[in-house]
Amino acid sequence: MPKLRSATSTEGRNMAGARALWRATGVKDNDFGKPIIAISNSFTQFVPGHVHLKDMGSLVASAIEEAGGIAKEFNTIAVDDGIAMGHGGMLYSLPSRELIADSVEYMVNAHCADALVCISNCDKITPGMLMAALRLNIPVVFVSGGPMEAGKTKLSDKLIKLDLVDAMVAGADSNVSDEDSAKIERSACPTCGSCSGMFTANSMNCLTEALGLSLPGNGSMLATHADRRELFLEAGRRVMALAKRYYHQDDESALPRNIANFKAFENAMTLDIAMGGSSNTVLHLLAAAQEADVDFTMADIDRMSRLVPHLCKVAPSTPKYHMEDVHRAGGVMGILGELDRAGLLHTDVFHVAADNDGTPGSGTLKSVLAQYDVMQTQDEKVKHFFMAGPAGIPTTKAFSQDCRWPSLDNDRQEGCIRSREFAFSQEGGLAVLSGNVAENGCIVKTAGVDESNLTFVGSARVYESQDDAVAGILGGEVVAGDVVVIRYEGPKGGPGMQEMLYPTSYLKSRGLGKACALITDGRFSGGTSGLSIGHVSPEAAAGGTIALIENGDRIEIDIPKRSIKLAVSDVELNARREKMHSLGPMAWKPIGRQRYVSLALKAYAMLATSADKGAVRDRSKLED
């Protein structure tokens, strides 16, 4: 039987000092011997997705203590990608993922915690905590802060739904009046919570459900809704149940690496493709898989992208649906149910929402779907749960409203979630492209690409930084037919792999959204749509071909054939490569770029791998 990890600091006379310190935190005599459950919170007043999390740790703790555990909360950092966007702050976003993972590991291992609840929400926080949870491999439950309500405003007497990207595009569009731009800005982000579309934060919170590490509704229940309170309480109860199964019953199915195994990663990626999730999820799933010692690679993603249909279309891919609409249609469990009926899901994987009593099928995703898939459940409480809707009242308070939709969206022919027969498209919302531009692959969010742009041929317009590209787009350098190339923005070359939401938004605002393509070794916000191809690997700073592209080069993109090609002969490419090598210390570095890079970012860059490896640390440089 596994011994409680916390016994290291709570048992034996030689631990009298540690026990004295535990007592100073509020631990009583009769508490020693109980499991110590770490609560990793990420409250901050900087981020709307986290501004309401201050009291959530206490809520989880109350359920843990009622179930017989000791709850101890700590906090991690949280960067708001939207506020950090478009300036030097974005260099810190992806590296913060590694800091979050490390900080969770440090706190949990330093204090010998027995299990973990992760209270996350936004872009790098959920992935960072996921990496830590799989690294630690102790019982864990994820519970996020939830999505914000979609914005709503009237323009020309017409009520429209909005999100963050609408505010950015309107602000850069000279055809939008100052009055309308201000109205959109004030309405786009009305409540606390992660931005309201299928952007990175919501995509990742949905994927934790598919991985089996969070409860049904985690990815879709609004931050403002009173029903979300129960998710926090249940997270506390479930982590205690998992801890008892592992430490008292020697049940290793309660451990995250036995839940989030290869099949579970396939489920998560299948969901991601089906719902047209953010391309950043590829980066984070690859990173998490490495922490779990799961051999899940770009080749698996490429294979799956050809098989999985696009079943759920949400902003920014359409203005019609937001996360509140996904929830009304059954949330993640509704999408997984359709994937199961299409024969595309592994339902024999374990899930934290299900008890494993040893009988066949118990503790698995199959049993969770039987209860929570709105198309098959007979549980009226579950149906009531998925009818939770928005109130339309601006607020930063969690659980501040209890509005309901009049009915569920069970329309699998024309609704928010479709069956395979009526899919938005028979190929999914993400694709892996490869060719001489990206020998190790690159990612495009096909859910946001207009059908007319699935094949594209254009002339390269090369920029050595995002800043230069923005200036070029707004200054009129970029014209219809161009392929904007932004390089040296990868994990190592940026460093930090900036998001390119501003360049893509400005292309739209100038009427070039369907007339140009953009490729980069950086990445894109979950709010990006259009022919935007990121994660080019190897990156420019690692010797990738993207560093050899010159202005005017012909670039051919063919999404159906999964191809991206620089139409330059091998002889010419080899000559360019030799010329680059001849530059010595200046080889594979941006020409003329003026950018301050702090010591912290330089340390990150020294160990960073390219995007096809998840932009994680290069372990070969750390292992003996």
From Swiss-Prot:
The active site is at S525 (proton acceptor). InterPro entries: Dihydro-acid_dehy_C, DihydroxyA_deHydtase, DiOHA_6PGluconate_deHydtase_CS, ILV_EDD_C, ILV_EDD_N, IlvD/EDD_N. GO terms for biological process: isoleucine biosynthetic process; L-valine biosynthetic process. Its EC number is 4.2.1.9. Binds 1 [2Fe-2S] cluster per subunit. This cluster acts as a Lewis acid cofactor. Its cofactor is [2Fe-2S] cluster; Mg(2+). Keywords: 2Fe-2S, Amino-acid biosynthesis, Branched-chain amino acid biosynthesis, Iron, Iron-sulfur, Lyase, Magnesium, Metal-binding. [2Fe-2S] cluster binds at C122, C195. It catalyses: (2R)-2,3-dihydroxy-3-methylbutanoate = 3-methyl-2-oxobutanoate + H2O; (2R,3R)-2,3-dihydroxy-3-methylpentanoate = (S)-3-methyl-2-oxopentanoate + H2O. The keyword Zinc does not apply. One of its GO terms (molecular function) is magnesium ion binding. The keyword Amino-acid biosynthesis applies. Homodimer. Functions in the biosynthesis of branched-chain amino acids. Catalyzes the dehydration of (2R,3R)-2,3-dihydroxy-3-methylpentanoate (2,3-dihydroxy-3-methylvalerate) into 2-oxo-3-methylpentanoate (2-oxo-3-methylvalerate) and of (2R)-2,3-dihydroxy-3-methylbutanoate (2,3-dihydroxyisovalerate) into 2-oxo-3-methylbutanoate (2-oxoisovalerate), the penultimate precursor to L-isoleucine and L-valine, respectively. Belongs to the IlvD/Edd family. This is Dihydroxy-acid dehydratase. It comes from Shewanella baltica (strain OS195).
